[in-house]
C-alpha cells in the first residue's frame, strides 16, 4: 500500500517537474496519503507524508511547483505530515514570514506586527513572541496565533503553542534583527520562485502549448474567441480561470529584486474595473510587456484572488491577448458628414469631461470636416483647440455658450399714460397643471379688485382641465380633482375675467407667466389678448430693492409684513400681491417720482438690472478674425462688468460687438426653445428674430424636461422640435441639429455625473437625471431625427451644419510671434547705460574680451527687439533699490553682461578677473584657473596700488538667449515680499493701467480631489467600488476646470500699439470681483510666446536683508564674499562658538538660505567647501535632479572627482567642454540636451571622447534629468553669504530678523523656558519620524534655530503685554521678546488689533484686553497661564478716572 502511495508521489513529482536527483533527497519515502477533490469549487487537497522536515527552500520550491502545475484546473492545498517532526529556532525562523503571509490573516496591522519579528524557543522549548505592551499581546493572542499555529502544522511541524511575552526592549531588538535578516533572504527566495515557475512554463510550452501569435501582443497562450467573457461587474469573489476583456487605462512595469518584471494593468469594461498582474518568465515576456499600451484593449485569462498588497480582488493573469474592440463608426459618405456646432470640453467648469484634443481626434477619425468648441461662458479651450485642429488638419470653429440676459426686464407692459395713484387694480394669480402655456391648463383663476389698498371685489373660479390632475399638481397647488370636476370651461371663465377687469390696471407677481397662460387661452378661443396696462411686482421689487437675496412672494410678504395665509392658492396670493403692489408703487413715487404707468420702465436698466434678468443660453461663433476679437470683448465684459453668479452678456452689449459673430439659439436653456415649449409659436417667433440660426437637440437631451414634467412626453417633445424646424423655415433661418455635447462616449457619462454630484445642491443639475449627451456620429444623429423624415433630418443634421461651418473664416486665436511693448528710446538707453557702466568698471577703451562680449550681447538684444524687456527690468530694480530693497535675480539673467551693467543683476558673467576701482585696470583668467572671481586672493593694482576687486563667474551668454541669441529673455526677479505689491503696481505707472494684467491660471481637478469626489459618490449612492474602478473613475474626472487664479509673480504687458483683446479676454481671478488685479482669461502658458510676461516674485531673502540692514546699519553690498568666519560656517561650527553636539548639526548653516536644510547640510558635511565657487557648485547640485545622489556624490566619494570639477550647474557643461577642446556650438547643444534630461546622441559622445573630456564626465551627463542655471546659483549664494555674515557678527540681530521674517510656527513656551525645554520639544518631533505633520516639521526648523541661539548665550522672553510687537521679535539686550503672533492660534490681524488698542490706552483688565484687543478666552487663558497678564484683574473696575480714559 505504501509502495502504491509512494508511486503516486513519484508521479506527482514528475508532473511538478521535480525528478532530478537534486530534488529527490527529501522525498525518497514520501507518499500521497489522500487527495480530496472538490469539483464545484475546483479545489484539490493533498495530504502528503514525508520522512523528515523539509528545509524551507525545498518547501517553497515544492509549493511553487505545485501551484504552477495545476493553476489552470484547480486551486491546490497541501498538508504535510512528518514522521519525525522537528522544532528548532532555525526552522521556526526560516518558515516564519511565509507562514504569516499564508495563514489567512486579513488584517494589515496583524501581519505587520507578526512580520516585524521572529519567534524563538526558550530553554523549556516554548515558542515565544514579544509584545511591547498588554494591548499588543491581547491583539496577537486573540487574532493571530491560532491561524499561525495551524499553518505551521500543515507545513509538517509538530503541534505547539505560541506564547506572547511583554518586553519592550526585546520586542524592538527582534524587530531590528528580523529586518536585517529579511533583506538578506528576500532575493534568494524570489529567485527560487522565479526559477521554479520558469522551469514549469518551459516544460508546458515544450509539450505543445499554443505558440505566440504574430502581430498584436500576446503574453501566454492565445485565448479562443468562443471562450465566454465575464463582465467585471459580475465578479464579486475569488474565481478560477476567468476571462475578461477591457480597455487599458493604466500600465506599470516594475523590476523586482529577483530580476523579473511585474506587469500591472488596470483595465475596464465600463461595468467595473480590475487590476491585472503578470510576472515575467523571461526576456520574451518582458518584450511583450512593452507592447501592451495604455489605450489598447486586451483579453485576459487568469485567477481572481484577494491581493494582500492591494487588499482587493485582483486578476492574476496567465494569458493576456491584445484584441481589437468594436468602436463607434461614422458610415456617412464622404462629404455628407455632420459638423458638431455645440460642444463642451473640460474647460466648461465642472460640467464636461473630455479635452478638446479628444474630440478633435475623434472627429478626424470619423472624417468630419469641422468642429466647434462652445464651452460655458469661457473660451479657455481655444489655445488647445487651435493646436489640436492644426495638428489634425480639420477646421476649428471658435465659439462660446454665453449667458444672454436682457439689460433690464420691464416692470410695466402695455404702457399707458394713466395715473397710478387712485387707479383701480385687478391683482390676479393662476394655478396651472404645469409650466407650459401651450401644453398645460389653468385650473384656478383668482383675482381681487383693489382701490386705495382696499379690496372692493373678488373673482375666484376653478376650471375643469378635462383630465385628471397629477399628484405633483395637487401637492403644489392643494387643488384636487373633486375641486375642479364639473367646473366652468376655460372659455367661459376667461370671458368672465375680462368683464371683471374692465379697464383696470392688471397686477401680478411674475406676471408674464400668468399673462402668458391667459393670452394663450384667449388665442385658443379666438379672443383678443389682454390690452390693459400691466404691472409685474417681481421686477418692481428687484428694481426697488436690488440687494434682497430672494424675491419669492412669501419672502417679500414676510419682509414687508403682508399677510399670506396660504401660499400657492390663487386668491390668497393675489391679495398679498395687491398689498405689496401698493407699498412698492408708493416707494417708487417717493424715490423716483414715478406717477404714471408709462414711467415704470424709464429706470428698468438701473440698479444692476442685468443681475435680475434670467440668463438664457446662446451660442456665439466667431465668423471672422474681427468677430473673434469681439468675442474676446464680450467674454471680458461678462466676466468683469456683468458677472453675477455667472458671467452674463447683456443683449445690448452683444448687439454692440455682434460684428463678425454668428448667434445661435442654443439648447433647451435658450429662450427660443423655452418660448416654443411654454408660450407657443408666436412668442418663439418674436424671440427667434434675434438669432442667425436655430438649434434642436437629439431626444436624449430633452429627457430631463420630460422627467420634470415641463414636457408631457416624447410625442410633445417631437412636436416642439417640428415646430422649431417650421419656425426656421418660416423665418428663413437655418435650423441645425446639435448635440449639446458634454462627453465623448456614452460610457463617459459617469464621469460627468460624479463631477455634478460633487457640487451638491448648489448645482441644479443634481435635481434631475443627467441626459446622455455624448459626441454623436452622423448616423446616430440621423437616426435620432428620423421622425422628421429623411429629407428634413439630413437638412438639419448635415446640410445646414456644413453650410454654417463653410460660412466661417479660418480664425486664429493665437498669434504667431512675440509682441513686445515699446518704450521710446529703449535701444539707445540700454546701449548708453551699458557702455557708461562698462567704461566706469573697465575703462575706455574696454578690454577686448569685454568689448566683444558687450557688442555681441547688444547686437542680439537690440536686433531682436529685446531692449524694452531689459529696460523694464532695469526700471523695476532701480526703483526697488532706491526704495531701500535689494533685488535678487533668478534664472539665467545673470548670464547676461548687459543685465549686470544696467543694474538688473549683481551677478557678473565674465570670466574670473581682477578690476581696479580707481584706474580700471583689469586682468582676466580665461583658461579655467579659477571658477569665480570671488575666490581670487587679495591683490593690489599693479598700475596704481589700489586693492583690486575680484569678480566674474564665467557664465556663457548662450544659456540666456540661446546659441543664436534670439530666444525670448525670461527675466525673473526676486523682490522683497513686502515690496512685491509696490513693484507690481509700478508696472501700471510704466505702461498704463489698461496695458498690464496679472498672468491668469486655470485650476483643474487634481488626482486626489477626483479621488475624493469618487469616494463621496460611492458613499452617497451606497455603492462599493473596487480600487481599480475608483482609479478609473477618478482618472475620468481629473483635468476638468475647477477654478481660475493668478500667477503669484507674472505681469503681462500689452504693447501700446495693440490691446489685450488682440491676445486674450480678461477676467478676475476665481471670479472674485473685489480682486485688485484683472488677469488674462487664457492660461498664461498659452500666450507665453505672444506677449511679454515679467516675473516679479516675492521672496524672503530681500526682506531679510532689508531687516538686517535696518537693525544693524550695515550696507549689505559692502559685505565681503570671502570672509573666513563666514566661510567657516559651511564646514563647521567654530564661527558660532558652539560645538556640533550643542546645536545637533556639524555645520553652522542652520537658517542660512539654501544651505540650512538637512539635505544640503549633509552635502556640506561630505564636501567641506572652502570658497565661493564650491558653494556655487553645491547650490547647483542641490537643485538639480539626478545630479548629486547617485552621481556627483559617488564620484566625490570614490575619488574620481572633487567638488570643484563635478558638474554642478548647466553652464559648467558648456564651459567645461570648451575647455576640453570641443567646439562651442556642440558644447552648447550638449548642455541643452543634458539639462533637460535628454541624454547625449552617440555622434556627440564620439566628439566628446575625441577631446580631453574624461569618460566619467560623459557618464555623469547621461544620468542627469534637470540642471540648475549657474547664474541663479550665484545669486542665491550671494544672498546666503550676506545673511551668514550677520549670523556670525551680529547674532542677536540675525535671530531677531530670522524669527520675524522667515518663521511662522513657534513653541513660545519652550523657547522662553530655555534650551532644555527646546531640546525636549525637538526630540518629541524627531521621535515622530515620517509621521510628523508639515506644521511640526516647520516648527522643528524654528526650534533648531532657537536652540542654536540659546546655546550661543542669548535668551527668549515670553510675550510682554507692554513691549511685544504684533509680528516682530524685539531686541532687549541679549534677549528677544516674543511678538503677540507667537501665541498659539493668535493670527496677525488680532495681534495688530492688540497693539493698536494698547497704543490707544493701556489695558486695565483681562476683560478690557478681550474686548478691545478682540482676544478669545482661549488666548486669555494661555496668556494668564504663562504670566503675560500678571497683575491684571479679570474684570474692569469702576474708577473715578474712567470718564477721562
From Swiss-Prot:
- Matches recorded under SUPFAM superfamilies: Nucleic acid-binding proteins, Ribonuclease H-like
What GO CC terms are in its UniProt record?
cytoplasm
Q: What's one GO BP annotation on this UniProt entry?
A: DNA-templated DNA replication
Coiled coil ranges (UniProt) are none
Q: Which reaction does it catalyse?
A: DNA(n) + a 2'-deoxyribonucleoside 5'-triphosphate = DNA(n+1) + diphosphate
What protein family is recorded? Belongs to the DNA polymerase type-C family. PolC subfamily.
Q: What is this protein called?
A: DNA polymerase III PolC-type
Amino acid at each position: 500500500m505504501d509502495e502504491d502511495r509512494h508511486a503516486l508521489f513519484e508521479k506527482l513529482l514528475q508532473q511538478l517537474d521535480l525528478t532530478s536527483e537534486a530534488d529527490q533527497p527529501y522525498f525518497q519515502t514520501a507518499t500521497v496519503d489522500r487527495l480530496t477533490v472538490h469539483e464545484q469549487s475546483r479545489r484539490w487537497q493533498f495530504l502528503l507524508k514525508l520522512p523528515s522536515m523539509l528545509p524551507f527552500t525545498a518547501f517553497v520550491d515544492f509549493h511553487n511547483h505545485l501551484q504552477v502545475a495545476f493553476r489552470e484546473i484547480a486551486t491546490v492545498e497541501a498538508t504535510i505530515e512528518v514522521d519525525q517532526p522537528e522544532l528548532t529556532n532555525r526552522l521556526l525562523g526560516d518558515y516564519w514570514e511565509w507562514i504569516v503571509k499564508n495563514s489567512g490573516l486579513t488584517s494589515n496591522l496583524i501581519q505587520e506586527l507578526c512580520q516585524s519579528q521572529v519567534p524563538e524557543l526558550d530553554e523549556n522549548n516554548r515558542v515565544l513572541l514579544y509584545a511591547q505592551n498588554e494591548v499588543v499581546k491581547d491583539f496577537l493572542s486573540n487574532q493571530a496565533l491560532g491561524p499561525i499555529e495551524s499553518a505551521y502544522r500543515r507545513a509538517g511541524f509538530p503541534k505547539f503553542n505560541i506564547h506572547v511575552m511583554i518586553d519592550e526592549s526585546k520586542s524592538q531588538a527582534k524587530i531590528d534583527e528580523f529586518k536585517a535578516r529579511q533583506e538578506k533572504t528576500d532575493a534568494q527566495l524570489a529567485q527560487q520562485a522565479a526559477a521554479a515557475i520558469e522551469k514549469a512554463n518551459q516544460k508546458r510550452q515544450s509539450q505543445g502549448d499554443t505558440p505566440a501569435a504574430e502581430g498584436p501582443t500576446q503574453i501566454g497562450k492565445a485565448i479562443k474567441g468562443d471562450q465566454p467573457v465575464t463582465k467585471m461587474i459580475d465578479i464579486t469573489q475569488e474565481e478560477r480561470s476567468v476571462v475578461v476583456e477591457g480597455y487599458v487605462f493604466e500600465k506599470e512595469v516594475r523590476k523586482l529584486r529577483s530580476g523579473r518584471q511585474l506587469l500591472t494593468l488596470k483595465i475596464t469594461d465600463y461595468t467595473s474595473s480590475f487590476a491585472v498582474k503578470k510576472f515575467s518568465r523571461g526576456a520574451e515576456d518582458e518584450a511583450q510587456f512593452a507592447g501592451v499600451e495604455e489605450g489598447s484593449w486586451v483579453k485576459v485569462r487568469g485567477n481572481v484572488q484577494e491581493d494582500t498588497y492591494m487588499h482587493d480582488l485582483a486578476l492574476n493573469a496567465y494569458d493576456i491577448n491584445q484584441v481589437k474592440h468594436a468602436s463607434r463608426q461614422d458610415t456617412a459618405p464622404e462629404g455628407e458628414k455632420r459638423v458638431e456646432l455645440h460642444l463642451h470640453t473640460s474647460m466648461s467648469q465642472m460640467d464636461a469631461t473630455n479635452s478638446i484634443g479628444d474630440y478633435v481626434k475623434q472627429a478626424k477619425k470619423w472624417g468630419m470636416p469641422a468642429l466647434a468648441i462652445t464651452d460655458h461662458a469661457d473660451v479657455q479651450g481655444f489655445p488647445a483647440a487651435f493646436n489640436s485642429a492644426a495638428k489634425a488638419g480639420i477646421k476649428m470653429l471658435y465659439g462660446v455658450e454665453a449667458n444672454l440676459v436682457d439689460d433690464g426686464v420691464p416692470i410695466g407692459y402695455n404702457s399707458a399714460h394713466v395715473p397710478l395713484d387712485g387707479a383701480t387694480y385687478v391683482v390676479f394669480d393662476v394655478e396651472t397643471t404645469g409650466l407650459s402655456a401651450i401644453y398645460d391648463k389653468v385650473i384656478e383663476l383668482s383675482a381681487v379688485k383693489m382701490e386705495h389698498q382696499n379690496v372692493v371685489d373678488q373673482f375666484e373660479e376653478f376650471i375643469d382641465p378635462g383630465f385628471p390632475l397629477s399628484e405633483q399638481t395637487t401637492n403644489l397647488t392643494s387643488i384636487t380633482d373633486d375641486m375642479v370636476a364639473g367646473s366652468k370651461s376655460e372659455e367661459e371663465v376667461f370671458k368672465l375675467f375680462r368683464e371683471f377687469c374692465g379697464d383696470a390696471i392688471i397686477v401680478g407677481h411674475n406676471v408674464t407667466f400668468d399673462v402668458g397662460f391667459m393670452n394663450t387661452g384667449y388665442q385658443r378661443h379666438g379672443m383678443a389678448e389682454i390690452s390693459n396696462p400691466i404691472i409685474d411686482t417681481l421686477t418692481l421689487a428687484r428694481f426697488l430693492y436690488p440687494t434682497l437675496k430672494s424675491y419669492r412672494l412669501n419672502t417679500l410678504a414676510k419682509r414687508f409684513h403682508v399677510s399670506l395665509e396660504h401660499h400657492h392658492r390663487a386668491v390668497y396670493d393675489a391679495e398679498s400681491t395687491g398689498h405689496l403692489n401698493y407699498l412698492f408703487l408708493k416707494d417708487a413715487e417717493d424715490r423716483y417720482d414715478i406717477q404714471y404707468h408709462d414711467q415704470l420702465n424709464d429706470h428698468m436698466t438701473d440698479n444692476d438690472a442685468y443681475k435680475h434678468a434670467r440668463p438664457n443660453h446662446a451660442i456665439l461663433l466667431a465668423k471672422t478674425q474681427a468677430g473673434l476679437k469681439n468675442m474676446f470683448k464680450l467674454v471680458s465684459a461678462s466676466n468683469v462688468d456683468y458677472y453675477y453668479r455667472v458671467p452674463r452678456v447683456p443683449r445690448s452689449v452683444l448687439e454692440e460687438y455682434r460684428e463678425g459673430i454668428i448667434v445661435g439659439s442654443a439648447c433647451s436653456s435658450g429662450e427660443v426653445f423655452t418660448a416654443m415649449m411654454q408660450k407657443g409659436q408666436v412668442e418663439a417667433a418674436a424671440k427667434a428674430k434675434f438669432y442667425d440660426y436655430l438649434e434642436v437637440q437629439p431626444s436624449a437631451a430633452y429627457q430631463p424636461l420630460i422627467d420634470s414634467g415641463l414636457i408631457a412626453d416624447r410625442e410633445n417633445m417631437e412636436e416642439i422640435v417640428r415646430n422649431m424646424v417650421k419656425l426656421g423655415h418660416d423665418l428663413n433661418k437655418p435650423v441645425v441639429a446639435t448635440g449639446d455635447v458634454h462627453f465623448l462616449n456614452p460610457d463617459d457619462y459617469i464621469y460627468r455625473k460624479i463631477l455634478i454630484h460633487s457640487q451638491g445642491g448648489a448645482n441644479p443639475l443634481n435635481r434631475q437625471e443627467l441626459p446622455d449627451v455624448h459626441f454623436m456620429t452622423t448616423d446616430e444623429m440621423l437616426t435620432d431625427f428620423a421622425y422628421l423624415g429623411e429629407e428634413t433630418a439630413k437638412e438639419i443634421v448635415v446640410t445646414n451644419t456644413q453650410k454654417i461651418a463653410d460660412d466661417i473664416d479660418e480664425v486664429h486665436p493665437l498669434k504667431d510671434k512675440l509682441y513686445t511693448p515699446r518704450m521710446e528710446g529703449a535701444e539707445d538707453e540700454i546701449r548708453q547705460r551699458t557702455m557708461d557702466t562698462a567704461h566706469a568698471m573697465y575703462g575706455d577703451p574696454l578690454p577686448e574680451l569685454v568689448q566683444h562680449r558687450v557688442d555681441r550681447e547688444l547686437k542680439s538684444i537690440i536686433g531682436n527687439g529685446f531692449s524694452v524687456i531689459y529696460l523694464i527690468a532695469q526700471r523695476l530694480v532701480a526703483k526697488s533699490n532706491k526704495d531701500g530693497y535689494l533685488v535678487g535675480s533668478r534664472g539665467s539673467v545673470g548670464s547676461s553682461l548687459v543685465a549686470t551693467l544696467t543694474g538688473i543683476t549683481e551677478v557678473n558673467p565674465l570670466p574670473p578677473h581682477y578690476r581696479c576701482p580707481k584706474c580700471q585696470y583689469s586682468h582676466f583668467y580665461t583658461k579655467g584657473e579659477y571658477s569665480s572671481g570671488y575666490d581670487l586672493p587679495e591683490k593690489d593694482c599693479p598700475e596704481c596700488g589700489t586693492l583690486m576687486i575680484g569678480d566674474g563667474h564665467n557664465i556663457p551668454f548662450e544659456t540666456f538667449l540661446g546659441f543664436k541669441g534670439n530666444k525670448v529673455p525670461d527675466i525673473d526677479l526676486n523682490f522683497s515680499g513686502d515690496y512685491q505689491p509696490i513693484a507690481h503696481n509700478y508696472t501700471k505707472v510704466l505702461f498704463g493701467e489698461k496695458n498690464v494684467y496679472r498672468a491668469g491660471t486655470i485650476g483643474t481637478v487634481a488626482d486626489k480631489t477626483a479621488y475624493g469626489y469618487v469616494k463621496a459618490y460611492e458613499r452617497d449612492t451606497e455603492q462599493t467600488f473596487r480600487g481599480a474602478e475608483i482609479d478609473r473613475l477618478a482618472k475620468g474626472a481629473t483635468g476638468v476646470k475647477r477654478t481660475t487664479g493668478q500667477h503669484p509673480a507674472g505681469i503681462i504687458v500689452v504693447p501700446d500699439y495693440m490691446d489685450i483683446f488682440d491676445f486674450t479676454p480678461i477676467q478676475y481671478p476665481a471670479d472674485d470681483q473685489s480682486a485688485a488685479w484683472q488677469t488674462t482669461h487664457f492660461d498664461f502658458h498659452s500666450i507665453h510666446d505672444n506677449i511679454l510676461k515679467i516675473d516679479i516674485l516675492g521672496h524672503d531673502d530681500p526682506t531679510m536683508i532689508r531687516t538686517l540692514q535696518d537693525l544693524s546699519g550695515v550696507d549689505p553690498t559692502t559685505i565681503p564674499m570671502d570672509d573666513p568666519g563666514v566661510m567657516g560656517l559651511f564646514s563647521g561650527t567654530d564661527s558660532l562658538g558652539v560645538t556640533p553636539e550643542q546645536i545637533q548639526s556639524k555645520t553652522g548653516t542652520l537658517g542660512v538660505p539654501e544651505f540650512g536644510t538637512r539635505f544640503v547640510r549633509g552635502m556640506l558635511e561630505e564636501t567641506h567647501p572652502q570658497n565661493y565657487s564650491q558653494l556655487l557648485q553645491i547650490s547647483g547640485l542641490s537643485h538639480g535632479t539626478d545630479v548629486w545622489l547617485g552621481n556627483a556624490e559617488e564620484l566625490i566619494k570614490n575619488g574620481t572627482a572633487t567638488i570643484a570639477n563635478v558638474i554642478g550647474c548647466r553652464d559648467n557643461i558648456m564651459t567645461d567642454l570648451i575647455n576640453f577642446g570641443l567646439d562651442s556650438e556642440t558644447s552648447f547643444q550638449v548642455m541643452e540636451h543634458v539639462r533637460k534630461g535628454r541624454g547625449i546622441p552617440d555622434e556627440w559622445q564620439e566628439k566628446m571622447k575625441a577631446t580631453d573630456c574624461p569618460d566619467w564626465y560623459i557618464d555623469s551627463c547621461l544620468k542627469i534629468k534637470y540642471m540648475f542655471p549657474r547664474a541663479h546659483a550665484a545669486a542665491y549664494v550671494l544672498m546666503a553669504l550676506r545673511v551668514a555674515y550677520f549670523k556670525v557678527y551680529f547674532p542677536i540681530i540675525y535671530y531677531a530678523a530670522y524669527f520675524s521674517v522667515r518663521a511662522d510656527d513657534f513653541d513660545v513656551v519652550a523657547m522662553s523656558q530655555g534650551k532644555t525645554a527646546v531640546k525636549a520639544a525637538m526630540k518629541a518631533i524627531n521621535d515622530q519620524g515620517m509621521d510628523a505633520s508639515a506644521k511640526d516639521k516647520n516648527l522643528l526648523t524654528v526650534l533648531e534655530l532657537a536652540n542654536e541661539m540659546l546655546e550661543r548665550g542669548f535668551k527668549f522672553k515670553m510675550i510682554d503685554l507692554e513691549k511685544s510687537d504684533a509680528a516682530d521679535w524685539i531686541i532687549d539686550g541679549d534677549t528677544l521678546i516674543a511678538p503677540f503672533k507667537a501665541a498659539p492660534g493668535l493670527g496677525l490681524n488680532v495681534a495688530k488689533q492688540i497693539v493698536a488698542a494698547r497704543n490707544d490706552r493701556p489695558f486695565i483688565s483681562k476683560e478690557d484686553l478681550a474686548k478691545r484687543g478682540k482676544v478669545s478666552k482661549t488666548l486669555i487663558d494661555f496668556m494668564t497661564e504663562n504670566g503675560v497678564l500678571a497683575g491684571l484683574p479679570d474684570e474692569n473696575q469702576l474708577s473715578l478716572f474712567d470718564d477721562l480714559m
